[in-house]
UniProtKB/Swiss-Prot annotation:
Lineage summary: Eukaryota, Viridiplantae, Streptophyta, Embryophyta, Tracheophyta
Major localization listed first in the record, in broad terms: secreted
Function description: May play a role in plant defense. Probably has no oxalate oxidase activity even if the active site is conserved.
Domain of life: Eukaryota
UniProt protein name: Germin-like protein 11-1
Organism: Oryza sativa subsp. japonica
Binding site for Mn(2+): 111, 113, 118, 157
Record flagged with keyword Secreted: yes
Family: Belongs to the germin family.
Signal sequence interval, chain numbering: 1-23
Amino acid sequence: MKLSTVLCCYLLLLGLFAPEIISDSPPLQDVCPMAPQGERKLFMNGFFCKSPSTIMASDFKTLLLNHAGDLDNMVRSSANIITATEFPGLNTLGISMARTDIAVSGAVLPHSHPRASEMMFVHSGSVVAGFFDTKGKLFQKTLAEGDVFIFPRGLVHFIMNYGFGLATTFSVLNSQNPGVVGITHAMFAPDSEVAEGLMARMLSFRDMGMDDSSSVDSPWFY
């Protein structure tokens, strides 16, 4: 068999099985709430399951997204991500959830989730949401209550309040541990002059009325 044929077969098989390799492992049982810290004997990629005899309905309910977070900060926003660590019932299900509250003229500074895509639902208010692809192209939309927007996995994205009252969004991410890389936190203090400059830059995107897609000179693109 020619080398090119073997290579094509290899690439085809890789394409078929790669999604299973790079995504969260599928559950091997109906449910698997995370075991309490004291019951863990080994470290692993994920968490051990509780004994089936101790699983309760309360393992699948959380109140952690019921209330708005603290908005008394420079960016006037709060983002609360709930993973399997905080909500045991999520263990092995490959999802996590988040609530974001943004005061008037507030924003969620640019960040990314290295292990998950994010689907965001606007619960109340109006926001501008956008992300940058790897070529620096900005994809941005103005969203109203009930709208949904997608942030692709690993891409830098942001949210800004575009209304005259509190804006609240809820998100689902397709990993029980999506990770958060905050651009401002990674490079400089969130209350620094550079962070303030980023905030001003984001507000300029909003005020220019950019929508759909545009190429911009992004200070946090790399």
